[in-house]
Amino acid sequence: MSELKIAVSRSCPDCFSTHRACVNIDESNYIDVAAIILSVSDVERGKLDEIDATGYDIPVFIATENEERIPAEYLSRISGVFEHGEARKEFYGRQLETAASHYETQLRPPFFRALVDYVNQGNSAFDCPGHQGGEFFRRHPAGNQFVEYFGEALFRADLCNADVAMGDLLIHEGAPCIAQQHAAKVFNADKTYFVLNGTSSSNKVVLNALLTPGDLVLFDRNNHKSNHHGALLQASATPVYLETARNPYGFIGGIDAHCFEESYLRELIAEVAPQRAKEARPFRLAVIQLGTYDGTIYNARQVVDKIGHLCDYILFDSAWVGYEQFIPMMADCSPLLLDLNENDPGILVTQSVHKQQAGFSQTSQIHKKDSHIKGQQRYVPHKRMNNAFMMHASTSPFYPLFAALDINAKMHEGVSGRNMWMDCVVNGINARKLILDNCQHIRPFVPELVDGKPWQSYETAQIAVDLRFFQFVPGEHWHSFEGYAENQYFVDPCKLLLTTPGIDARNGEYEAFGVPATILANFLRENGVVPEKCDLNSILFLLTPAEDMAKLQQLVALLVRFEKLLESDAPLAEVLPSIYKQHEERYAGYTLRQLCQEMHDLYARHNVKQLQKEMFRKEHFPRVSMNPQEANYAYLRGEVELVRLPDAEGRIAAEGALPYPPGVLCVVPGEIWGGAVLRYFSALEEGINLLPGFAPELQGVYIEEHDGRKQVWCYVIKPRDAQSTLLKGEKL
C-alpha cells in the first residue's frame, strides 16, 4: 500500500522537508494526499474552500513569506502555518509528517486499520486457511499465477478467527464490533450487522429472528425469493399478499395505494386467518421492498404512517437502494431517518452493499432501528437477532469482505458521502439529456413534461434536487402504472431506465413493430457494455459514484449506433455476430428488424405484458392449496413428480418458479399452477424454441430437450388418495 503524498502549491515558498512524494495542488483530486500546503494567494482564490468541500478533512498548512498575514477567518480551518526560511525546514517537516501520519491512520476505519496492522506484523501462521498467506498456492505454477494476479496482500489478509487479536465476527467483539458500531452511526441505525453472504442471507436472518409458524406476515408480492425462503419455507409464517404493479414495458412497480388501507388489510386477514382480523396489531412483520429492482422508490414515512400501527416490525428490503439518505431529495424515503415513538413499529433494513454501494460481491448489512420499542413484548433484543445471525453466518468468514463493509461506511461518512452521490445523480441526469437529444427510439424513463415544459429543458442543478422530475404522477401516460396515489412513488435517479420501441405510451398497447430490449442488451454486450438487466421493452443500467461522463457517453454512442443499424435494417450477422455464429442455420439471412419483428410478434401474440401484470394482481394470484413449508417438505421427501408444463395445470407447485433476474417468484410452493403464471411460462417456452440465443434464465422449472424441442418441466406434489380428484382434475 503506497504512502500518501503531500499536495503543494506552485506558489508556496520552499519551507519544509518531507520524505513523501509531492504533487502539484492543481493536478490533484486529493484522493491520495495526506496533507496540503497552500500559499496565502491560494486561499484567497478559493483553494481552501475547494478542499473543505470534499469532506475528506485533509490537514491544510499555509506557507507564508515576508511576514504575510493570513486573514483571521481562515485560521480555524487550517492545521498550521509555515514561514519561509531554511532554519525551520526540518521542524516544519516534523509537524507536517505528524499531521499526515495521523490523517493516514484515521482514514482507515476500525476493522480495516486493525487488519492492516495485523498483516504487517508478519505472524507465522499454523492455522486456517490452509493456503497460509498464499504460500501453499505458490508451491505450484497455477497457484503462483493465482497469487500474482490478485496480489499477496489479499492472501495475507485471509485470516482465521483462531487469533483473537482481530476480534470476533460472530459474537461481535473487538475491531468487528467497533466497525459495525461506526456503520450504525453513519447509516443512522441503532445497531448494524455486517453479513457476508448477500442480502439473501440478511433477509433470512431477520425473518428467522422474528417469525414463527402461524405468525401473520404482510408480504409484498414483489419480494425477492429470499423473503419467501425465510418467512414461508423456513419460518412457516402465514403470508398476506399485497398486489403490485407492472407496466407494459416490463418495469416492476410498487404496491397499489389501496393495499395500505387498514380496512382492506383486515379483509385480507379475514381470508387467511379470520380469528385474527380484529386484533389491534395483527402482523408480526411486514416485508416491503423499499425500492424495486426497476427503481420504483417508496416513501418510508407514508408506509409507516399507513400500516405501522398494525405491525410489530417492518422489514424494508433495501437490496436495490441503501444510498437514499445521502441524496437530499430522496432522504424522506429513508426508513433510517424516521423519527419514531413507542407506538411505531420496529424498523429493520437490509441492504445489498455490493449492488450500488462500495462492496465486494456478497457484502450486505442489516440495520436495526427499534430502541423506541425496547422493553415491549414485541421487541427483538440483540441476543435473539444474533442467534439468527449465527445460524446463517459462516464460521470461516472472509476478512476482506468484512473490511469492504467497513470501508463502505467510512466512504459514506459526512460530506464526502453526500458529494459522491450528488455527482452520481448529476451524471445520470446529464446522461438522460444526452439520450433525449441524440436518440429517436430509445427513451429514458422519466416524465416527458414537467409543468408543461420538456424534462430536459430544465437546468441539471434544479432536476438534481427536485423530486418532481422523477415522480410517478397518477394517470400520466409516460409510466403507464396504475393504482398509485399522489406522491407515493418516484423513479430512482440512480437507475438509468430506458424503454425500447413497441409500446404505445398513450394506451399501453402493442404497436405494429417493436424492439425487444434483450436484442439491445445483447448488442451492448457484443460491444463491451454490460447492462444490469432487461425485460420486454425495458433495460436497466445501475448508476453509482463509479460513473463518469466518459463512460456514460460511450453508452450513449452505442445507443445511437444501434438506432442507425435499426433504421438501415443491418444484417443480423453484423449486429449480433456471436449469436449469429452460434445459430447461423436458424438466422441465416436475417436482418435486425426481421429479428425484432419476430420477437415482438411473439410477445404480442401471447400478450406477455398483460400476463406479467396479471401474475402480480390479487385477482390472478395462483390459488393456495398447501402451506409453502409443507409443500417444500413434500418435495424433500420425494412426494413429487416431474411433469411437462401443460400437465402442471391444476397441480400443486413443489418449487417456486421464476425468471432470473429479477428473482421474484411467480408461483410459490403450495400454490396451484394455472392461469396467468402457466400461460407466461408457456410463452417463455415458445420463445426458447423459436428464438435460440435469447433464452432467459429460469429457476424452479427445468428445460429438457425431447424430440428436438426444448420443453419446460416442473415438480408438482403427488396427489394423495383423498385429494386425487381435486388435485388432478382441477383446471384454472
Language-model features: where?
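Non-catalytic terminal extensions of PLP-dependent enzymes
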Residues: S2-A165, E173, K185, Y264, ...
